[in-house]
């Protein structure tokens, strides 16, 4: 099951919080709010790609909408003299309606290389810029593992390098327990638009295990840092001849007698 389903959806309600949190009063309102949430997310993911938006969470009541944006470069969303954020607020207000009270919060993420969406977008951008596929995937693997991830899996599908027949290419590094529900697996999918067609990019990142109860937004690699390995004790070298040379039987007897004599003198 872990290999088939969306890794985020499998963990919602267990160790991941829902990205849309609201209760609609009717089926019609449910459909309306779902479309609005998708438009709000596309506003950030498509129009503000340079800001490296990792996630957009939305909370609603009947009269209010709270939008939480997590980005690697929030300054690009805010803009000089708050011009961009004012523009974004107006666009979201048009989507949800003028009568709804809107609250927009922009947060900076500490480890952008541990976000699957940012990594997938980087690979898609590299493919669109005609970077060799193998090097683009290898660079992504190296960045993620250096950032402290326990494992990463990358799957690219489509007409790779302009081939006539579509195929898949996959790289896996480290540990990737997709069926372990307490594992903090972050999954994202992006599209690279090329002259040969659309190439799909899927990224899974293993950020460690979550043992705490409840829905915690703090990444596992911060909650449970890996223990440092203890250094092996060093043995001090002695100045005795026995430790440095191969000794004969008579030499060993002489050395042991000398050690006994020194011992007796110390006791006296």
From Swiss-Prot:
Query: A GO molecular-function term, please?
Result: rRNA binding
Q: Does the keyword S-adenosyl-L-methionine apply?
A: no
Q: Which residue range or ranges hold the KH type-2 domain? A: 40-110
The reply to whether Cell wall biogenesis/degradation figures as a keyword in the UniProt entry is no
Instruction: Please provide the record's keywords in A-Z order.
Output: Ribonucleoprotein, Ribosomal protein, RNA-binding, rRNA-binding
Q: Which family does it belong to?
A: Belongs to the universal ribosomal protein uS3 family.
The record describes the protein's role as: Binds the lower part of the 30S subunit head. Binds mRNA in the 70S ribosome, positioning it for translation.
The subunit structure is: Part of the 30S ribosomal subunit. Forms a tight complex with proteins S10 and S14.
Protein name in UniProt: Small ribosomal subunit protein uS3
User: What gene name is listed for this protein?
Assistant: rpsC
